């Protein structure tokens, strides 16, 4: 496995899916945030001009990933913000606290590919491997 975190789109009928890979649990959540905003727009078009604190809790690691991505998507939809930088400050199997950086949507610079309606549990998994962590997530679009 590559020692750097990365994501790869997967084929999924009518929805958008990603496989996520990272050497650590914290980096898995950072790369998941990048995958979410990759589905929405071009990541390279987002500048880290504003900062937001994000904290979520859940009963297990799969639910934590869904809660994390759902919270990011909530701010995208309600505050019209896009994020490109994800600093995971604290993470456990049931909680994550992070500072995310990005900017307000600028229609002159951001081409919106799709709107994420929901982060789903469909085909979701999060697991530790001998090379680090991997996950799969499907977004309802």
Language model features with spans:
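N-terminal intrinsically disordered, cationic/polar leader segments
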Residues: 1-141
């Amino acid at each position: 496995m590559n020692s750097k975190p990365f994501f790869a789109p997967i084929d999924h009928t009518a929805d958008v899916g990603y496989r996520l890979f990272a050497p650590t649990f914290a980096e898995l959540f950072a790369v998941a945030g990048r995958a979410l905003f990759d589905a929405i727009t071009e990541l390279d078009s987002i500048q880290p001009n504003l900062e937001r604190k994000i904290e979520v809790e859940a009963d297990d690691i799969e639910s934590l990933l869904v809660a994390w991505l759902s919270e990011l998507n909530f701010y995208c939809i309600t505050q019209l913000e896009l994020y490109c930088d994800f600093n995971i400050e604290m993470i456990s199997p049931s909680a994550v606290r992070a500072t995310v950086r990005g900017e307000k949507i600028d229609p002159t610079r951001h081409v919106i590919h799709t709107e994420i309606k929901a982060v789903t549990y469909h085909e979701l998994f999060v697991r530790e491997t001998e090379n680090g962590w991997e996950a799969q997530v499907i977004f309802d679009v």
